[in-house]
Amino acid sequence: MSAVINKEALLAKIEEALRRGKPRRFRQSVELILVLREVDLSKPENRINLLVELPHPPKPNKVAAFAHGAFEVQAKNAGVDAVISRDQVEGLSGNKRAIRKLAKQYDFFIAPPDLMPLLGRVVGPIFGPRGKMPEVAPPNVDVKSLVERLRRSVRVKLRNEPVIKVRIGAEGQKPEEVLENALAVLEDVNRKFSLRQYLKDVYIKKTMGPPVKAKALEVLAR
């Protein structure tokens, strides 16, 4: 990634964003916003939905498991924050309010393949647009490793607009840690869209803070 991004320039923008804005009564997140150009999002192949593991997550994500049988035992042993049974899923059918509440409660969900058709019918219409559909856990997967990875990950999406917004840190973290998180996101995006070709602008901002803007040429290595 160092061959593509000017780390010193991006770090300076992160430091500026962390300095700016009034103190708040809560710990603000630090957001990375990428504006792309010349990306035809009418083509499905140009849309992205990635999970990026951050080297320095600002806090562990909450992970819930839709599970039954042996997978339920594995999920509990992996330390998930909640286990939702097949019966509970069926009980959610038609209860949009409860499904929306569940989607807000947890950052990520996991499920075995055999539960996915039921989940698609019951929670899919609400979970899908929110990017909350469960990660499928294949039969031989190390469930504990999967849960640990999800606790450290962020979802990077590009769908209807050529803009990517993702949390890369929080107040109280070292700027260098936020930088390494940003580089992890940029590296994965660069695999799909060459940043040298498609990146237009970069913004760094705290939740309630003013955005710090950088043109692509300012943060791309020369």
From Swiss-Prot:
Family annotation (PANTHER family): 54S RIBOSOMAL PROTEIN L1, MITOCHONDRIAL, LARGE RIBOSOMAL SUBUNIT PROTEIN UL1M
InterPro entries on file: Ribosomal_uL1 (IPR002143), Ribosomal_uL1-like (IPR023674), Ribosomal_uL1/biogenesis (IPR028364), Ribosomal_uL1_3-a/b-sand (IPR016095), Ribosomal_uL1_arc (IPR023669), Ribosomal_uL1_CS (IPR023673)
Organism: Pyrobaculum neutrophilum (strain DSM 2338 / JCM 9278 / NBRC 100436 / V24Sta) (Thermoproteus neutrophilus)
Lineage per the UniProt record: Archaea, Thermoproteota, Thermoprotei, Thermoproteales, Thermoproteaceae
Keyword Ribonucleoprotein: yes
Protein's recorded name: Large ribosomal subunit protein uL1
HAMAP family (alphabetical): Ribosomal_uL1_A
Family membership: Belongs to the universal ribosomal protein uL1 family.
Summary of subunit composition and partner proteins: Part of the 50S ribosomal subunit.
CDD domains noted in UniProt: Ribosomal_L1 (cd00403)
